[in-house]
Amino acid sequence: QDARQIERMIEGRHGLMTLMAYELGKLGGMAKEETPYDAEVAGDAASNLSALASVLSPELFPKGSAVGEAEDSEALPAIWEKPDDFAQKISDMEEAAAKMQAAAGTDLASLQGAMRDLGAGCGSCHETYRQKD
């Protein structure tokens, strides 16, 4: 892939992560009881998150897009050193987002339980495959 294609992939994954963080912020605020629980808002945010998670793919991380290889990248080389584990973590994220979609609009306790799993999935991938700020 050429430099421009790689740059577009990085922009795409940054945009995707930004949108996911936006929806997670709504859910996290409710889970932490910083904002009132609203089943409709939670359900919509979880549906959006699940749809976004389904777009997340190892294809958004082409070779040549690691930290030090491409501008604005936070992707660690471990992504390409352990591609099967990376792909599994993405799959786990999709599964956790689907569980959140099923739980979020039910009640606060269900949202909180799903949020723990979702947060653990996000953290696990970022800990291993994303450069710390």
Curated annotation (Swiss-Prot):
Gene Ontology molecular function: electron transfer activity; heme binding; iron ion binding
Gene Ontology CC, one term: periplasmic space
InterPro entries xref list: Cyt_c/b562 (IPR010980), Cyt_c_II (IPR002321), Cyt_c_prime (IPR012127), Cyt_c_prime_subgr (IPR015984)
Keywords, sorted A to Z: Electron transport, Heme, Iron, Metal-binding, Periplasm, Pyrrolidone carboxylic acid, Transport
Keyword set includes Disulfide bond: no
Pfam short name (any one): Cytochrom_C_2
Binding site for heme c: 17, 122, 125-126
Keyword Ribonucleoprotein tagged: no
Localization per record: Periplasm
Chief location: periplasm
Modification Pyrrolidone carboxylic acid occurs at: 1
Any Gene Ontology biological process: electron transport chain
Post-translational events: Binds 1 heme c group covalently per subunit.
The protein's role, per its UniProt record: Monoheme c-type cytochrome, that is particularly expressed when cells generate energy via aerobic respiration.
UniProt name for this protein: Cytochrome c-554
